[in-house]
A protein has these predicted regions:
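Short terminal alpha-helical segments
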Residues: 2-56
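Short acidic DE-rich linear segments
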Residues: 3, 145-160
Length: 160
């Protein structure tokens, strides 16, 4: 899947050339903001999230020109009452993958900031912390609605 040029996947050619080490360091630096909520990532866990992001980009065929989406997701969700130390990395991984899936399915009609804000509102609200509900019900409705409106401003509500 995906086009290749000279043995390299086309989407890989456009990834910003930040080293995984640099990206992981930026994620670990967020511990200062998340520790107050009892959430902390090790360097190995941060590297795992960098790899999840890279795999998600490849899977969806997306190209990322600016790093920082993982950090935005961490900042947005770190004070959720539904996050715990035990499932923090797994939850972040699922949110990263879901973010890329929605961006792809809506042809980028939703800005990153709006999508992250709406994911958080639904996660803490109608989904009560359920990633399955967020992915299966709410996000599918968001995708349908965003595509139907062609990207017009919208807010995710219980009746979305």
């Amino acid at each position: 899947m995906g086009r290749h040029i000279g043995g390299e996947r086309l989407t890989d050619m456009f990834l910003l050339p930040l080293s995984p080490e640099t990206e992981a360091g930026a994620i670990v630096a967020l511990n200062r903001e998340t520790e107050g909520n009892g959430l902390r990532l090790t360097h190995a866990q941060a590297e795992q999230l960098v790899e999840v992001r890279a795999q998600s980009l490849r899977r969806t065929g997306r190209i990322e020109f600016a790093p920082g989406r993982v950090e935005c997701i961490i900042r947005a969700f770190c004070d959720s009452p539904y996050l715990s130390r035990e499932d923090y990395v797994d939850t972040l991984s699922a949110l990263i993958e879901l973010f890329d899936t929605v961006k792809t399915e809506t042809d980028d009609r939703i800005s990153d900031a709006v999508l992250i804000e709406e994911m958080r509102a639904a996660f803490d609200g109608v989904c009560h912390g359920s990633l399955e509900l967020l992915a299966d019900e709410v996000i599918s409705r968001v995708v349908r609605r965003a595509n139907a409106r062609g990207g017009a401003e919208w807010k995710m509500t219980e009746d979305t």
